[in-house]
Swiss-Prot record:
Reaction(s) catalysed (UniProt annotation): alpha-D-galactose 1-phosphate + UDP-alpha-D-glucose = alpha-D-glucose 1-phosphate + UDP-alpha-D-galactose
Principal localisation: cytoplasm
Annotated protein name in UniProt: Galactose-1-phosphate uridylyltransferase
Biochemical pathway: Carbohydrate metabolism; galactose metabolism
Similarity-based family: Belongs to the galactose-1-phosphate uridylyltransferase type 2 family.
A family per Pfam: GalP_UDP_tr_C
Amino acid sequence: MLLNQQLVQQFVTQAIAFGDYEQEDNIYIQNQLLRILNAIGIDVDNESPLNQDATANAIAQYWIEQAVNENYLEDALYKKEIVEAQILDLITPRPSVINRNFVEAYKKSPETATNYFYEITKRNHYVKEDAIANNINYEVETEYGDIEITINLSKPEKDAKQIAKAKAEPAKHYPKCALCIENEGYQGSVTQAARTNHRIIRLKLDGKSWGFQYSPYAYFPEHSIVLSEHHVPMEINKQTFVNLLAFIEQFPHYFIGSNADIPLVGGSILSHNHYQAGKHVFPMDNAAEIERFTMNQFSSVTASTLNWPMSVIRLKSENRDELINAATYVMNTWNQYSDETIDVRAFSKDGERHHTVTPIARYRQSQYELDIVLRDNQTSEVFPDGIFHPHEDVQHIKKENIGLIEVMGTAILPGRLKEELQQVKTYLVGDNQFDLGIHQQWAENMKRTYDINKQNVDDIVDKEVGYKFKRVLEDAGVFKNTDTGRQAFKRFIKHL
């Protein structure tokens, strides 16, 4: 395999412009490219196959495809990702340089600092904008406000060979998980993501060391992860609120929140303490207040319930310390609270804890805000997946845990729905009747409800998906939006 000389020079120019290199390093960079791609030399005879303004990532993708076509690289997703990360590491400054530059940029403003880091992660294809653009996104109007629907098509599917090879691989213990700080610069394997071009900003939250990185497959603008330096389990306690507000103090243009810390109502990774942050206004942010109340022991804190399908208490204050204490009080009270009339139980008979919260922090209108979303992970014979989990009749749309992002009103729906929903639409407007499997009853209900034709079928199905997600959130709410549920919520507030 030979690398086109003009492409090499285009890449070298960008490595010098964006990486740690100077003009005298051009031969060194060229030889690193030959090593990474297992190439045998430089093609000096042919014109560049790409435009002069091709990005480093576009050049890397061209070389990877060339290497596969010429049998220099196995056509396996993980092998291609490892090579891509190694190539694009050459246009990425070292972690120490990025951290130093981040601190300098922060002196201008927090937003200048995050913009600097975000641009690097997009340029070196750690944040995969091209893949993220494949997601299907739209909004649906509901009585709670507009909710956001995302059908997740960004993450590439592993093929059967890679899955089989991964199963045969011996268990790896370094890094311990996908969030560990040791992933920075890690080569990757069939079971672990390629992270050679990965960089982490070091932060202090309440005097402790944390890392800040962007998410490769973002669900919203500047989707970032704040991770503990140590591999310790998720835990929601007073320190969580301290950390969230410490982050907001440093980066007031971002929100930050945490998944819950117990199964069924938490995120997919409970083994490593982390939060998610970013620059997005979620539907729940704009939810209207229903009832304001005060807690006498926290005079500077205003509290309210929200017009939202899940059960949320919003706390606001200019006094950060009192807000932390109020949030801790609400959480501790909820963690011990039971109401048998609505199947809310803090503990099972054997003492297992069932209650926790999903907290979200933001800085708005010169006040700190903490949204405390009440969670309960009980199961029952009637609801084996969870009493406050998507029930069986909506699981054809969403059956996974309802985590932080969904709680705030953004559905992350599985990629299978793209094809399945197209089949539903074909069924609704066609004469040919065929079995839709898990979507059959839903489709029949739509046929009875609407006068459907080819002009309106897309809007109807999109809207009904939104209504299903609204139901998903209502299922996850502990105090339902019914007379009984509202009275029960008032009893809890009185208990506070």
